[in-house]
Amino acid sequence: MSETTPVPVGEAGEKSATALKKEQKKLEKEKKIAEAKAKKAAEKSAASGNSGEQKNEKKQEQVEENNSNWGELPMNQSKEKITREWTDVSQLTESLVGKSVLIRARLSTSRLQGANLCFVQLRDGLYTVQAVVAKGGSNSKSMVQFVGQVPKESIVDVQATVVSTSVPIESCTQKSVELQVSSFFIVSKSTLLPLQIEDLSRAQPLLDKQEDDLKQLEQLLQNTNLNEQEKTDLEKKKSECIKFVNVSQEKRLDNRALDLRVPAHQSIFRLQSGVCTLFREQLLGEGFIEIHSPKIISAASESGASVFKLNYFNTHAYLAQSPQLYKQMAICADFNKVFEIGPVFRAENSNTHRHLTEFVGLDLEMTFKDHYHEALDTLDRLMTSIFRGLETRFAKEIESVNTQYPFEPFKFTYPSPRFTFDEAAAMLAELNDPDYIVKDNDFNTRQEKRLGKIIKEKFGVDFFIVDKFHVEVRPFYTMPDPNNPQWANAYDLFMRGEEICSGAQRIHDPELLEKSAKSHGVVIEDIQGYIDSFKYGCSQHAGGGVGLERVVMLYLGLGNIRKASFCPRDPTRLTP
């Protein structure tokens, strides 16, 4: 059969429509997917020009975060020994221009100039230098921003090239050079400072003037006749007058570790160290032996109540008021010339500008052949050699102190002017002022200062000696004057009208010593060992004790002994 079998139209039509519908949906779905892909590709292609730069910057930032020339170093626990060549800020001079140096210092200040430049002041003790961090080469923008955000007083390691400056950098000690930084790392990061170093470093004359101006305005405000507008104007002037933070002495001492970072204060203690060094050098050169006496003793070393009492196991002990008795025991042991640098304790409730309950004593004792003035000559020679040494070896430190605390240069001559107590009292009496008539056989503080001014006017010096004091105002071991038992072979040394040393010929006869001790109220049993040491023969001897902090205070004209004490102790302060 050649004919085809007919297919029912209805059945064939229904099947064809369903298949077409499914195929249509499939095609539409595929089309949407294709369009979405095309759109995404088109957007990606259209944005390729701008997004390329953004991606590059992002990648660059990621690289910079891992940069090897800036950041914060891990804590140094001495894991390994590394040999590197370091340069002190003080060594940065024009002789190093063009050379690469490695510096460790404190970040004193930082100043961002836009996004790509930062100026930093680095401080190392007394010395400061400017460092510049600029974008370029291996220095990234992130590095510049990082340096600009390093907290003040952080300790940093800086690798840099020394370059000369066309204009002196007046804000730094190293004025003729600066550093072009190539690496910058934090060694020890500082937290928020309770006091700013800038405030602690402020020149005293600026603070004094501000205080004077404020007092004057305050006095004007006390006028009850002022109208409201006048009061408002004065209050405004008072507010405008306050330009500087005036940090009190108490706040400085409460934050002593920060206060001592100030260059002027660093210099004070370098000078203090210098006084000890010069004291030791001079006496060693004259044949003295350095000794170290005990500070916990069984009895008060001086008469009086100014002694710290301690519980010592099952008995009582005292803190030594001086090494006096032990210096003399050394003389009895034929040491002949001895000195000591050590702590001295005085339980005196004296809240003055020149008293401390603990200070450093510079003591000496020596035998003499004919007259106690041999010892006085030694003291004169010693002190003037110290003054001379400070001038020649510590000029930079003196200049640094003078910048913050201006003072007149210390004047002295050798031999120094000497006066008896009566001669000095007569100079004061010439003023015809009842306040300067010497009573009680000794000078008071006001009389001492006035005497210093008189001698400065007449002799042009700040250092002088007064000899032959009344025996009743000297310790029990002081030798009386054989020509007049009311006087003593005793002397004081003065700087700028304040006593810095008391000394005398000592009693070396045990019977006279015991008699004198009894007359001064000393319990003989407590010092029997001391008295007995003179029973086996003892050379005549003399000496003195100098207060270290007082010497530094007066030489630099500081006005308060607490500035010359590392961590001062007075009746109200036991910390830090």
UniProtKB/Swiss-Prot annotation:
<keyword id="KW-0067">ATP-binding</keyword>
<feature type="binding site">
    <location>
        <position position="502"/>
    </location>
    <ligand>
        <name>L-aspartate</name>
    </ligand>
</feature>
<protein>
    <recommendedName>
        <fullName>Aspartate--tRNA ligase, cytoplasmic 1</fullName>
        <ecNumber>6.1.1.12</ecNumber>
    </recommendedName>
</protein>
<keyword id="KW-0030">Aminoacyl-tRNA synthetase</keyword>
<dbReference type="InterPro" id="IPR006195">
    <property type="entry name" value="aa-tRNA-synth_II"/>
</dbReference>
<dbReference type="GO" id="GO:0005829">
    <property type="term" value="C:cytosol"/>
</dbReference>
<feature type="binding site">
    <location>
        <position position="346"/>
    </location>
    <ligand>
        <name>L-aspartate</name>
    </ligand>
</feature>
<dbReference type="GO" id="GO:0045335">
    <property type="term" value="C:phagocytic vesicle"/>
</dbReference>
<keyword id="KW-0436">Ligase</keyword>
<keyword id="KW-0963">Cytoplasm</keyword>
<dbReference type="GO" id="GO:0005524">
    <property type="term" value="F:ATP binding"/>
</dbReference>
<feature type="binding site">
    <location>
        <begin position="346"/>
        <end position="348"/>
    </location>
    <ligand>
        <name>ATP</name>
    </ligand>
</feature>
<dbReference type="GO" id="GO:0009617">
    <property type="term" value="P:response to bacterium"/>
</dbReference>
<dbReference type="GO" id="GO:0017101">
    <property type="term" value="C:aminoacyl-tRNA synthetase multienzyme complex"/>
</dbReference>
<keyword id="KW-0547">Nucleotide-binding</keyword>
<feature type="region of interest" description="Disordered">
    <location>
        <begin position="1"/>
        <end position="78"/>
    </location>
</feature>
<keyword id="KW-0648">Protein biosynthesis</keyword>
<dbReference type="GO" id="GO:0004815">
    <property type="term" value="F:aspartate-tRNA ligase activity"/>
</dbReference>
<feature type="region of interest" description="Aspartate">
    <location>
        <begin position="324"/>
        <end position="327"/>
    </location>
</feature>
<dbReference type="InterPro" id="IPR002312">
    <property type="entry name" value="Asp/Asn-tRNA-synth_IIb"/>
</dbReference>
<dbReference type="InterPro" id="IPR004523">
    <property type="entry name" value="Asp-tRNA_synthase_2"/>
</dbReference>
<dbReference type="GO" id="GO:0005737">
    <property type="term" value="C:cytoplasm"/>
</dbReference>
<dbReference type="InterPro" id="IPR004364">
    <property type="entry name" value="Aa-tRNA-synt_II"/>
</dbReference>
<dbReference type="InterPro" id="IPR045864">
    <property type="entry name" value="aa-tRNA-synth_II/BPL/LPL"/>
</dbReference>
<feature type="binding site">
    <location>
        <position position="499"/>
    </location>
    <ligand>
        <name>ATP</name>
    </ligand>
</feature>
<feature type="binding site">
    <location>
        <position position="302"/>
    </location>
    <ligand>
        <name>L-aspartate</name>
    </ligand>
</feature>
<dbReference type="Pfam" id="PF00152">
    <property type="entry name" value="tRNA-synt_2"/>
</dbReference>
<comment type="similarity">
    <text>Belongs to the class-II aminoacyl-tRNA synthetase family. Type 2 subfamily.</text>
</comment>
<feature type="binding site">
    <location>
        <begin position="547"/>
        <end position="550"/>
    </location>
    <ligand>
        <name>ATP</name>
    </ligand>
</feature>
<dbReference type="InterPro" id="IPR012340">
    <property type="entry name" value="NA-bd_OB-fold"/>
</dbReference>
<dbReference type="GO" id="GO:0003723">
    <property type="term" value="F:RNA binding"/>
</dbReference>
<dbReference type="GO" id="GO:0006422">
    <property type="term" value="P:aspartyl-tRNA aminoacylation"/>
</dbReference>
<feature type="binding site">
    <location>
        <position position="506"/>
    </location>
    <ligand>
        <name>L-aspartate</name>
    </ligand>
</feature>
<feature type="binding site">
    <location>
        <begin position="354"/>
        <end position="356"/>
    </location>
    <ligand>
        <name>ATP</name>
    </ligand>
</feature>
<feature type="compositionally biased region" description="Basic and acidic residues">
    <location>
        <begin position="20"/>
        <end position="43"/>
    </location>
</feature>
